[in-house]
Amino acid sequence: MPIQVLPPQLANQIAAGEVVERPASVVKELVENSLDAGATRIDIDIERGGAKLIRIRDNGSGIGKDELTLALARHATSKIATLDDLEAIVSMGFRGEALASISSVSRLTLTSRTAEQSEAWQAYAEGRDMAVTVKPAAHPVGTTLEVLDLFYNTPARRKFMRTEKTEFTHIDEVVRRIALARFDVAITLHHNGKLIRQYRAAPDKSQYERRLGNICGATFLQHALAVSWQHGDLTIHGWVADPVGAKQLPDMQYCYVNQRMMRDRLINHAIRQAYQDQLSDDQQPAYVLYLEIDPHQVDVNVHPAKHEVRFHQARLVHDFIYQAVMSVLQQASAPGLGMTSPETGKPVQWQQENRPAAGENHFAQPPRTDNSPSYGGKTPRAGHSGQAKESAYSGYQPENPYQKKQGDLYKALLQPADGAAGASNPSGEHISVPANRVMPPEVVVLSTVSHDSPPNRTAPDATTSSSKPRAPIESPLESQSNGFGRVLTVYPPCYALLEYHKGLAMLSLSVAERHLKAVQLTPSEEGLRAQPLLIPQRLTLSKSELSVLSAHHALLARFGIDVLVESQRATLRAVPLPLRQQNLQNLISELIGYLANYQTVETQQVEPGELASWMATRLQSEQESWSHSQAIQLLADVERLCPQLAKAPPSELLYMMDIHDAIKALKHE
């Protein structure tokens, strides 16, 4: 068969395979066109689940007579004109394929009128060449699209359509998602002549709850927690259900990027990760969230149905969503600070600044007067999307690019000081990181500790250590008097069976990890390096709590904890590396109460080592269950950084097992 150009109708039908999956796909494409045209009212009529009729009527700007023919042509659009427009899309549609694809698999009629025209015009395409016929019609300002007999000329596609009830259920879900995206638009949905849904316009935020309740139900409203966060050009707002409500709402996930409904895996993963400690694997979070981002930083042209996007700063977006949702969930269940307010005498509760209950969100921008994205002050509508290239987001610069390296630095911190694995510098310090990477001071300090405290050196607090003869050293983890010996196996959740001093011993991995954290958190003379948080956490504190922070500001700074105190609130801006993966809200809450106990006694000072040990007891373990290799790595780190602990392990860490009773039980002679 020779190469030939496909007829227009066949080419459009091929394109329709991606655009028109089912009647709900048609409704989505046509309603999004109405929104791009600036419509404030949209009426949707469906017959027989969309197989017989889909009618979309709006009061938008309309299409002029001269453009009706182009409107039904392939790759014809008023949304974009240049590559710059494609890289900063602010409209719902932009490919110019929807109307041509739909008209190729149905009998489509387009009727429209602009405010400048005295009469309306109607267009429809038919035949092998999809020739467009235009004739006068009666119609108010706006557009009406009628799609009759969907898939009438493609029997194979029509055969795969489901029942009328199933297809209408999908249409109803699409309308619900669109109604949640645009509260300012009134939408009605009829099926077989009956009014099914009616969403009245909610021009201000005080009326949002009514539509939210109509779509998501009373259960979601009862358990909804408001989210409102901003970081640079990233903004997220909406509602998430607390874990109790999420368990009752398994199919309540609505997410929007620049008012475009999404089913993006990165977004879902970030939200799911925020819930991970509060929901089981078979449960799903419930949320209605709106993410606004610079259009230059997101590519929506990656999915045929535009259900997925690609973020240029994917990690930044993921962490932003994760921390916003996690902070709100933690706030809902955060305990009090254990202190009382001098004014009221009541317990002071920990309050996140980005909760409505905590007052105004100081990260938020001034409120807008409409519900459209403020990209350069332009409202997306037909024929104006090309102005997006002049958006105010042109100066977007991502912050803290070195954040992605923190995991590598943390791994480098815990690497064993093996002479074969890394080179020593002139000072004898072992640092297994590239030469061009900036090493945090605490890493250098801890590396120095491992070399200043060799295994055969007696620690000051280890005078009671065993004086048994040293066993031959076969390997770093072989049985020896100055080590933990060899890890034989691991018993869930956190116990390791060791070959220790030619005997058997059971070791608590969680206790060993706590001692290791205490050493890592003990500051040197230079102090621990502060690692900036992606999103500073703001706290509303009482005068007594602010005085606690002010009195111990130097101590906290030495630990790498950067707290900015201003007026009646404080902002947590940075923490040391070992604390970055912790629940900072609960940890700082307990820390203020701990420091307050010392402030009541003027002569008593907080010792850094004691504070490091206290914080280590409050940290959550990084491992839910330990593997054999993880246990070996942990003990190697403890032997290297805490040699005195390996020489004289406390009873809470290691327990010698008496195997003589087992041997006697096995003797039957």
From Swiss-Prot:
Gene3D superfamilies reported for this sequence: 3.30.230.10, Histidine kinase-like ATPase, C-terminal domain (3.30.565.10), MutL, C-terminal domain, dimerisation subdomain (3.30.1540.20), MutL, C-terminal domain, regulatory subdomain (3.30.1370.100)
GO biological process terms, semicolon-separated: mismatch repair
Pfam families in the record: DNA_mis_repair, HATPase_c_3, MutL_C
Residue ranges, compositional bias (Polar residues): 448-468
A GO cellular-component term linked to this record: mismatch repair complex
HAMAP family linked: DNA_mis_repair
Family assignment from sequence similarity: Belongs to the DNA mismatch repair MutL/HexB family.
Protein name, as recorded: DNA mismatch repair protein MutL
Annotated source species: Pectobacterium carotovorum subsp. carotovorum (strain PC1)
